[in-house]
């Protein structure tokens, strides 16, 4: 998961409680943007444990999904698998609220303008495609959070033209593994660099855009230092950082 300031988080994976122990309480979280419903991004079982801390807050936690991703919530509401069928009760008690977002429409969520864009990656629902998020802060700082991404289709690339991003956080799931052409729903180093070239041509990014690589599968990639070296050698003119657990990123234009 990626915490954005005090009260917004992107995704809620199965390691959220370990992260809370290591990096601080999650009780201030008010909004959770879900990219897609694979369980490494939305571990619905965590909802049951989070509901035990309701005495620490008086307002619901709001979860946001793509329209197809929201269908997963509709299934959970009527399933005994989800806490014995008590999810509706949690909603009625004001513990959680679930919302649908449309691709390429902008919403005011917390202190950000949030625009979901269509990724090229599936989810638990048959027609689901990931929602990547363009987030604009009050000071104008603009960031793209791209998990899981794959190679974007033309509709998304067209939307991202001239976005002039300050920050780009991208997956690089398969690291330096050479992917077969049909494996285009995740990125490796080569396909990430291909996407970077497209973003450069389309003025989606600038040379001073801060770029971070995450969602890296340790089973299919070089060690951290080697992957960092690959990126530095390939694009020395860009600020590409291979991320790690606990990394803090300045998200304002004054570097704070």
Each model region followed by its residue ranges:
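Short, well-ordered amphipathic alpha-helices
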Residues: 17-19, 45-51, 73-81, 190-200
């Amino acid at each position: 998961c990626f915490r954005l300031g005090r009260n917004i988080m992107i995704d809620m994976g199965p390691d959220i409680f370990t992260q809370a122990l290591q990096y601080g309480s999650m009780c201030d979280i008010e909004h959770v943007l879900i990219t897609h419903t694979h369980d490494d991004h939305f571990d619905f079982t965590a909802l049951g444990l989070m509901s035990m801390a309701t005495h620490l807050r008086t307002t619901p936690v709001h979860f946001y999904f793509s329209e197809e991703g929201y269908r997963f919530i509709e299934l959970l509401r009527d399933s005994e698998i989800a806490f014995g069928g008590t999810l509706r009760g949690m909603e009625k008690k004001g513990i959680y609220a679930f919302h649908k977002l449309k691709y390429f429409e902008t919403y005011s969520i917390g202190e950000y303008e949030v625009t979901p864009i269509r990724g090229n990656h599936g989810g638990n629902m048959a027609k689901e495609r990931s929602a990547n998020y363009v987030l604009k802060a009050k000071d104008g700082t603009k960031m793209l959070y791209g998990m899981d991404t794959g190679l974007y289709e033309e509709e998304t690339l067209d939307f991202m033209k001239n976005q002039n991003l300050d920050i780009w956080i991208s997956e690089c799931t398969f690291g330096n593994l050479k992917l077969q052409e049909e494996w285009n729903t995740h990125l490796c180093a080569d396909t990430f660099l291909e996407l970077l070239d497209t973003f450069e041509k389309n003025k989606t990014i600038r040379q001073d855009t801060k770029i971070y690589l995450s969602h890296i599968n340790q089973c299919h990639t070089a060690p951290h230092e080697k992957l960092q070296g690959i990126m530095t050698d390939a694009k020395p003119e860009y600020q590409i950082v291979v991320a790690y657990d606990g990394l803090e990123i300045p998200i304002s234009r004054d570097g704070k």
